[in-house]
Amino acid sequence: VSAFEPPRYTTLTDVGVKRSHNQDACAAKPAVDAATYASCGHIFIVADGMGGHAVGEKASVKAVRDIPHLYQKHVHEGVAVALRRAFAETNAGIHEIGQQNPEFRGMGTTSTALILRPEGAWIGHVGDSRAYRIRGNTVEQLTFDHSWVWEIARRTGVDPDELGDFKRNVIIRSLGPDPEVEVDIEGPHPVQPGDVFLLCSDGLTGLVKPEEIGAIVNVLSLESAVRLLVHLANLRGGPDNITVILVRVPGGPQDADSHHRSSSPLARFRRTLSRHWPVWTILMGSAAALLSLLFHLQELKTVSLPLFLLASLIILVGIIGLVHSILRAPAETSGPDIPLTDPEMEQPRTLNIYRQHDCSITPERLNQFCEIEQQLITTLKEHNISVDWDTHAQLAAPADGDLRDAFRLRCEAILLLADAFHKARHKQESFQPSWTTPNQR
C-alpha cells in the first residue's frame, strides 16, 4: 500500500457457550499518521491464555499489551528483530510471574501479531492461534499451528486432518511456560488493495471452516462478518473462547466509490501538482531566467534585470521545496523501510503459505447455509424466542439467480436469527440446538 490510509478493521471476543471466563484477549493499534505507518505500521494481535481462569486471562492480557509496546520500542533495529525481541521479552515476563507466584505457575498464552507496513504484512506467531489472508476467492493460512497434531503431520508428511482429533488441542509451543521460546516470523507478505487479514483463536477455527470464513467475509461488512463468524462457532457448540480480528486493506471493491471520486482527472491533476510542485517551480524559474536572458540580449535591461531577480527567487523556492520533500520522503515512501542493520533481512525470506482454501460461493455452500437458517428458524420457533420476522421475510426474497447475492441474503438472515438466539442463550444457558461441526480445522 503506497499511500497512508488507515485500514478498516473490527475486533470481537466472546466467552463461548461452555466456558465461564474469557481467557482470550486482542488489541488493535493502527498507525495515526504516515510517519508512524512507515516506521512501525499498523499492529493487530490476538492471544489465547491457558492455565486456569485468572491465570490464562492474565497471560493473554499481558501479551496483547506488552508485545506491541516492545515491538515499537525495538523497531529501529528492524521489523523481524523487533518482533522476535518483543515476543521473547514478553515470554520472559510471563514466565517470571509464573515462577514467583505459585498460584500462577504454568500460566501461558498463544499469540499471533500482524504488522501491516509499506513493504507488506509481517506476522509474529507462537501457538495455535492463526493468521489468514483472504484475497478474492482464496483463503491462505499464513501461520503454522504449534500443536502436537501439526508437528507430527510435518514430520510424517501427512495432512493434519488425517490424524483425526487425537491430541488436537495439545500445543507444543506457547508464551510463559519456559524461560525461552522459539518465535515464528513470517513475511513480508505482499499486500494488495482489498486484501482481508484475519487473526483468530482456535475457538473459531475448530468449528468454522476456512472456506466458510472466506465466503462470509467476501459478502458482508467487516462488522457483520465478525459477528456471524462468532455466532456460527457458538451455534456449533462454542466449547472455547472465540476471538476474531478482521482487517481490510484500503482500495478494494468496498472502497470503489471513494476511489472513483479520488481518481477523477481533476483529482489526479491536483495530486500530481501537489506532489511535484518543487520541480514545476524550478522549471518555471528556469523559463523565466531564459526569458530574462533573451531580453538582456535585446538590451532591454529595465525588463531583464527584474525578471532575472524574480526567476532567481522562484528557483530558490523550488530548491527549498525539493530539499524539504527529500527529507520527508522516508516517512511517505511506498518501498520497504527496513534498516540495513537487520541481520534477518540480509538473506531473502521465504514467504510461507501453509494452506490454501477455495472460498468461492457455490450452490452447495448456499444450500448449506440455507439448511443452517432453517434449523435455526425451527429451533427459535420451538422455544418461542422473539425475532423480527418481518425483516427476516424481506431477507428471504429471491435474489433473481445471483448466487453471490443469494448467499449474502442468507448470511444476513442467519445473522438476524443468531442475534436473537444469542440474547436467549444468556437467559437460558441450557438451551442448545444440535449443530453439525465440520471436521476440517
Where are these regions (language model features)?
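Hydrophobic/aromatic side-chain positions at a characteristic register within alpha-helices
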Residues: 361, 398-402
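PP2C/PPM-type serine/threonine phosphatase catalytic domain
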Residues: 1-383, 387-394, 408-412, 419-441
